[in-house]
Amino acid sequence: MFEKAFTLAALAALVCPALCAEWLTDFEAARQKAAAEHKPIIMDFTGSDWCGACMHLHSTVFEKPEFDAFVKDRFVLLEIDCPHGDKMPEEEKARNEALVTRYAVRAFPTVLVLAPNGDVTGGFLGSGFSMEKIQQELQQGLDNFARLEHAQSLAGQEKLKALGEFYNALNNDARPCAVSLEEQIIQADPQDTLGFAHRRQVEQQRQQIKKRTLMLMQRRDPQEIMATVEELKPTVMPENMHMLLEMKMTGSVLAAQSEDDLAKLRDSLQAELDTLPDSPEKAETASQLKATFSDIPHLFYQVKAVRARKAQEEKLMQ
C-alpha cells in the first residue's frame, strides 16, 4: 500500500510540471514572455504569509485543474508576493512593493490582466467569486487586450478617443489600477478635451479631503471641523462639495446644544444639499443625512456621550 501511494505521489510530481500552470515571479521576465508569445499577463498581487483571502483564492481557484485548462495557451501567469515575513530577499520585496505603488493596489488579493507593455486590460479584487465568475473576468481582460491593441494602432484624435473609451469601459476594480494608461491619455490631450486631467484633479482633491477628515474625526473638535470647512470652501471643486457638506454635518452635529438645534441643522443641510448638482455622490450624501437625523433624540444622546468621553480623555491627559 505504501509503495503504491509513493508511486502515485512520485508520478504526480513528474506530471504536474507539464500540466500545472507556471507562475513567474519577475515582472520584466513575464513581460518579455508575453510579448514573445503575444499573450496578456495575469498578475496576482498576493500576501502568501498573511492574507487569508489570497490563500483562499489560490486553493479554490488557482490550484484547480479547471483554472489550468482555462489559462493554458491564453495567458502568462505572474505572482507578485508581498509577504510580511522575511522569507523574501529585500531586493525582490522592494521590486514587488514598487509594483504595488505603480498599479495603485488598494486591496489584497488584486488580480490584473495586463498587455505585454504593462497596460491594464481587466481584473478583479477579492476572493469571494466562483470559478465561472473569475473566468469571465479574465476572459474580459483577454478580449480587452485585442481592443487595446486596436486602439493603440490608430493615430491622432481617433487614437485618443479610442483609448479614452477603452479606459472608461474598464470595470470598477481594474480602472483605478490603469494609472499608466490614464497618464498616456492625459499627455496626449493637452487641451483636456476628454476631461481626464480634470477628473484626476477631482480624485486627488477627494483623497486629500478624506485624509483631513480622518484626522478631524480622531480629535472630534467641532470648532476645528468648522474652521476646516471654511478653509477648504474657496478651493473645493464642485464635484467634491458633497464631502464638504458631510464634514460640515459632522462638525455641526457635535456642536449642537439641543434636539431643536439638530432639527434646524437637518433642514439647513438638506437645503444646502438641494443646491448641488445631481450625482451618485450627492445621492450617497443624501442617504447619509437621512440616516443621521432619522432619530434626533437618540442622535442628541450620542452627541452628549461623545462630549462626555472627550472631556474625560482631556482630564486624564492633564
Q: Where in this protein do the model-derived segments appear?
A:
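Non-catalytic, surface beta->alpha helical segment in thiol-disulfide oxidoreductase systems
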Residues: 60, 98, 102-146
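Extracytoplasmic/secreted cell-surface and envelope-processing proteins
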Residues: 51-54, 87, 121-122
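Local sequence-structure signature of Cys/Sec-based thiol-disulfide redox active-site neighborhoods
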Residues: 25-67
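Loop/turn elements at helix/coil->beta-strand transitions in domains of secreted/extracellular proteins
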Residues: 37-41, 73-79, 106-109, 116-119
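Sec-dependent N-terminal signal peptides
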Residues: 2-15
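Short domain-boundary/entry signatures in modular proteins, especially
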Residues: 136-153, 205, 209
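Thiol-based oxidoreductase modules, predominantly thioredoxin-like and allied folds used
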Residues: 21-25, 47, 60-94
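Oxidative protein folding and maturation machinery
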Residues: 154-318
